[in-house]
């Protein structure tokens, strides 16, 4: 049975969904995630995403990015591990329970090729520039076979659907999520 609903993401929701920490827990207990984020011009997006993941309880966070982001990461979020872009290999994705892709990634041919390849076979959280790339490749939405969470703000969501009034937003979001079998977190003043 398909579940479809719109619910604000607020403190009450978060408190219900965040696991209690175990006395004998370790970084492997709380999730092993990869962030494919950041570029020379948008370092902050990668750094904020890494810090948010660590501070909300992720166990092991690895950031795949360029040298400038990695250098800043060691100061801004020393709990996160890193991998420089030029050393990336698909084996680095093995064992990851979640992947975030797109926050400040940048829009260029290399990013587009990589996003298209990664989205074709990996469960991911899709944000920022990866959403822009995905909007250019709707066939990926129609043919994906893994769990996807899309996190657009209203402007990014307009790249996928037409809506004229905010009152249409919830209906459009529900229809989109149902059609493409994705979880949609529509960011805004009242995140759904």
Where do the PLM segments sit?
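Small-residue (G/A/S/T)-rich helix-start motifs and N-terminal tracts that mark the onset
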Residues: 1-123, 132-149, 154, 158-192
């Amino acid at each position: 049975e398909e579940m479809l609903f719109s619910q604000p993401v607020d403190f009450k929701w978060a408190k219900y969904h965040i696991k209690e920490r175990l006395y004998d827990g370790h970084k492997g207990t709380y999730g092993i995630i990869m962030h494919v984020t950041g570029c020379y011009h948008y370092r902050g997006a990668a750094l904020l995403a890494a810090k948010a993941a660590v501070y909300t309880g992720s166990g092991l966070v690895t950031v795949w990015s360029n040298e400038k982001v990695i250098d800043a990461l060691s100061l801004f979020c020393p709990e996160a591990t890193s991998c420089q872009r030029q050393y990336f290999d698909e084996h680095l994705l093995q064992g990851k329970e979640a992947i975030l892709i797109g926050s400040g990634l940048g829009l260029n041919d290399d990013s587009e090729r990589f996003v298209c390849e990664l989205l074709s076979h990996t469960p991911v959280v899709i944000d920022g520039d990866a959403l822009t790339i995905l909007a250019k490749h709707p066939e990926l939405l129609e043919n994906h076979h893994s769990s996807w969470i899309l996190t657009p703000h209203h402007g990014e969501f307009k790249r996928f659907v037409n809506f004229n009034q905010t009152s249409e937003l919830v209906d459009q979001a529900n229809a989109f999520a149902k059609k493409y079998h994705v979880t949609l977190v529509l960011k805004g003043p009242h995140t759904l």
